[in-house]
A protein has these predicted regions:
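Cysteine-centered loop/knuckle micro-motif
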Residues: 22-24
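Short Cys/His-rich zinc-binding micro-motifs
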Residues: 8-18
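Short, flexible, mixed-charge glycine/proline-rich loop motifs
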Residues: 1-7
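Short, surface-exposed charged micro-motifs
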Residues: 11, 84, 112-114
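A short, polar/proline- and glycine-enriched secondary-structure boundary/capping micro-motif
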Residues: 34, 104-107, 133-137
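Short beta-strand edge/turn micro-motifs at domain boundaries
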Residues: 111-137
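Core segments of small alpha/beta cavity-forming domains
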Residues: 26-68
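Surface-exposed, charged secondary-structure patches
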Residues: 72-108
Length: 137
């Protein structure tokens, strides 16, 4: 059950229903690091919303991380829906939809994302074409 956001802290960008300070805010500020792939994905969405380039780079696998700059963060993100997630021991999958505004038109990004443990921390690796079987890997 999610905790409603209070007036003391705005609601989290990831649409969890929790206050930002008790959700992705602790990750974006460096106070903590997400311990699940879904929490990492939600925090990365919040980083895209707020333009937090250092956080995005830190949470992207070094083998697949592109060169990012502030021009890559101009999209106006509207909301996030986690469709489903599967947490493995070393690999995890999160499927989500993220809505954004393109001019006057609202569009949705639908992605199945691969996350892996790298140096004992979850990192985003890449989008996948379909749901793989990850078992306990």
């Amino acid at each position: 059950m999610s905790t409603p956001a209070t007036s003391a802290s705005p609601p989290c960008h990831c649409c969890s229903g929790k206050p930002l300070a008790q959700c992705c805010g602790i990750y974006l500020s460096g106070q903590a690091y997400p311990n699940t792939a879904e929490a990492l994905m939600r925090s990365r969405y919040s980083a895209f919303v707020t333009g937090n380039l250092p956080y995005l780079t830190k949470t992207w696998h070094p083998d697949t991380c592109p060169e990012l700059n502030s021009d890559d963060l101009t999209t106006r993100w509207q909301r996030l829906e986690v469709v489903k997630s599967k947490q493995g021991l070393k690999k995890s999958i999160v499927e989500f939809r993220a809505w954004f505004t393109d001019g006057d038109t609202e569009r949705a990004l639908h992605e199945i994302s691969l996350f892996k443990l790298h140096k004992k921390r979850w990192v985003y690796v890449e989008p996948l074409d379909k749901w793989p079987s990850i078992g306990a890997s």
